[in-house]
Amino acid sequence: MSTTSIESNNDIGRSVKTIGVYSIGPEIGKGSFATVYKCFNTKTNESVAIKSVVRSKLKSKKLVENLEIEISILKTMKHPHIVGLLDYKQTTSHFHLVMDYCSMGDLSYFIRKRNQLIKTHPVISSLLERYPSPEGSHGLNEVLVIHFLKQLVSALEFLRNKSLVHRDIKPQNLLLCPPLHSKQEFKDGGFVGLWELPLLKIADFGFARFLPSTSMAETLCGSPLYMAPEILRYEKYNAKADLWSVGAVLYEMTVGKPPFRADNHVQLLKNIEKSNDRIKFPSAAQVPESLKRLIRSLLKYNPTERVSFNEFFNDPLIVNDLEGNDEPLETSEMDENLFISEYISPIKSSQKSQYIEPITTEVAVKEKSKQDLPAREVSTHASESQTKAVDTRPSSRDEEIKEIINKNSPGPETSRSIQPHNLKEKSLVLKNKDNDIILERDYVVVEKRAVEVNAIADELAHAGSGAVAINPRRTSSGSDNSYNGPNNMQLYRRPSLRSNSSGSQRRPSFTDRRISISISPTNALTKAIGLASNRLFGVNASGSPTNRLIEETDERLAINENNSSMNATNNTFSTILSNPNFANNLLIQKLNLPTSATVANNSQTNTSPQLSPQSKTDESVLNRLESLATKAHAINLFADVKFSQLIPSPPSSDALDDDLLHQNDMLPPKIVKSISEEGVVLYVKTLSLLAKGMVIASDWWYSQFEIDDPSNKNSNENPLKQSSNNNSDDLSLAVRINELVQWIREKFNECLEKAEFIRLTLQEANTLLSNEDSSEYMGNSNSVADKTRVVAEKLIFDRALEMSRNAAVNELVKEDLKGCELAYSTAIWMLEALLDEDSSNDEDRLDDEDKAMVEKFIVSIGNRLSVLKRKLEVV
């Protein structure tokens, strides 16, 4: 086998041009351990799919065994309705499985995207014109359902004869190929169904096992939404588990959604048990009785009551001939080499789906920052040494915080029923319509603030020269190379940022925003966060060109403690909440937390009587901005957890099996609505805190005109340029304020776009709910869950207390003490955010009793944090 000499461990598509005789094409699929590429044989010019499995990710014996079994099974699988293994290659870093290329994607994609594909894909257009879905139905035409069923059964019967159980039957593993060109070719190939329709093939045998009919297995595997209840109960099971999965897939083909849905395994099993074998079909789906009967026989809770394989294989729907048109579909304009997603036209910037595909979790961005960027961006990234050091990425610490928040997150349904821990729920119960109006009103207010936020940030940015924004106040003693020169200005004023003339204009794509934040953050942004970190946490943390693990960060901070007297403007840090050594001066005063010598020295220095009156004012403003920024950042991470639940998440953990990545692919509209409502109010809360910070910055900025030019004779000049004689403290504080303002602006715009995405998702969920049978989605229309208005304050309060409780339990058993410290710190900031209310919104303001209770919890958690910090110092 001949390959190029360079091969990446994570993404062969960026470095390897060929694998043997196969030329590597674009990526068409991705899982936890493997990436699928569209390739073609350079000798025959035939398209193939290559599944490349990264060796380094197969860290357990079980994973290697799964791959070996999949390969051994596929080598013996020669069936027209099973994806064939054409070739197999190995390198030092990858296993490459060369397989049949199925250009029409998977069944799940076909069901979900057919309304878009009908406009652009010639075969699907012809297919759905001939066999349209019933009016008002989200499912497929009866003929298509039975056609695909026949082909699926043909493959299962073949597996059954070989004593194989697939264990992961789901729409994502049922791939589609274009119809064959003639009826004779169809017969010669041994296919079943209608010759003129697309072909279905079973794929992904990673969980398959040789399991004789008398044997039982007990491994939890497969996709939760299609798992048999005996697997969900962790009981032993046999091949009949596949029959349940077939029933679930068949139901989805007829109705357009899985028969049972939930946000976790436990709730899914409860929903299945609650149904008591009563499978309901929406009237709009117009499912024929014969199909209903078959589906119900497959979806029997008790495996012994489930239809047998013999009965299933001999069902009249399967054995009887299916009458078709016997005329070929329109294929003249189809290019069989194009993958199905390539037929969907570019998405308009106004459509929400622009946000979905490019979104990745911060961890994924961290792992893929180099290989996933276009070549020109990679080279830019490599050449910008300062930026590279800056991009130590907030993901390491932020992702840990998100994990802590998510770990303590009840499901969307559960969270509605949690008592508010004595936090009053005055006016929380409203009609859905009123709730939507309130969400819309809050969102519109935030949208309007975007103009003001960007305007003041632009004015500050242009006051000096980019990153040097208030440069005229600099003195020689305060010079810093990182602020000088045009390069930093160019980095800061990169094209993806809003210009002064378009401060209120939205970015055309979320992709640009993610790249600008995660890949090429500005020097000013990093400086701002680093400076804020110094004040907030009392530690001078030096930057790192790589995203070190938390333990490494803590060690580095301990080492750098001796260097704490360095000027704060020389520090770089990746995020406001990046240091668990939580010692914000504001909280020190309130909670009487222990302070290190470093913090004490910094505090004494910062409050030195040598500071000019202007410096004292600037320092006060900086303190307020840093406090608001940190509170906003904590709530933003909570909101990001909700955001990540609504988008297709790329694999972020080697421990995740591929099937688990599809849990959120098709969440029930009711769950989507619940998550979206929570996400919107959390982002609105974040935005209100950030906007409040910008108001403070605006007042400070315009007060400079009055200070420097009371007579207002030179109001058109930058007042700071008239203060060249100010000392270095004045200059340093002003620059730090400006940098923090730019960070707030960037975070504000990012949150606004995410809130917009969630708002559109919420609208879509509401539309689906209004169109569906109320008994299917809404349950009891008088239920509290359907009337409860989502309030950010309650969500934040509940989550902060849950985090601190779990941290206390872990602390008692001496488990993950660093994580406990981070959980306590984050919980305190979240509760502090509750006390920082929006003066313009009286409806959700806490009364005095509630405020006193929140403050009590802050003190209580702060005391726990104080005790824990002393423990860690001893350790």
Swiss-Prot record:
Q: Where is the signal peptide?
A: none
Boundaries of every Protein kinase domain copy: 22-318
* Annotated active site: D168
Q: Which keywords belong to this entry?
A: ATP-binding, Autophagy, Cytoplasm, Kinase, Membrane, Nucleotide-binding, Protein transport, Serine/threonine-protein kinase, Transferase, Transport
Q: Which reaction does it catalyse?
A: L-seryl-[protein] + ATP = O-phospho-L-seryl-[protein] + ADP + H(+); L-threonyl-[protein] + ATP = O-phospho-L-threonyl-[protein] + ADP + H(+)
Enumerate the CDD domains for this protein: STKc_ATG1_ULK_like
Q: What is its EC number?
A: 2.7.11.1
Query: GO terms for molecular function, please?
Result: ATP binding; protein serine kinase activity; protein serine/threonine kinase activity
Instruction: Report the locations given in the UniProt record.
Output: Cytoplasm; Preautophagosomal structure membrane
Composition bias of kind Basic and acidic residues appears in 367-379, 390-405
Membrane-related topology note:
Peripheral membrane protein
List residues binding ATP. Answer: I28, G29, K30, G31, S32, F33, A34, T35, V36, K51
A single GO cellular-component term from the record reads: cytosol
Q: Write down the InterPro entries for this protein, in alphabetical order.
A: Atg1-like, ATG1-like_MIT2, Atg1-like_tMIT, Kinase-like_dom_sf, Prot_kinase_dom, Protein_kinase_ATP_BS, Ser/Thr_kinase_AS
Tell me which domain of life the UniProt entry assigns to the organism this sequence originates from.
Answer: Eukaryota
Please give the subunit comment from the record: Homodimer. Forms a ternary complex with ATG13 and ATG17.
The name on file for this protein is Serine/threonine-protein kinase ATG1
**Gene behind the chain:** ATG1
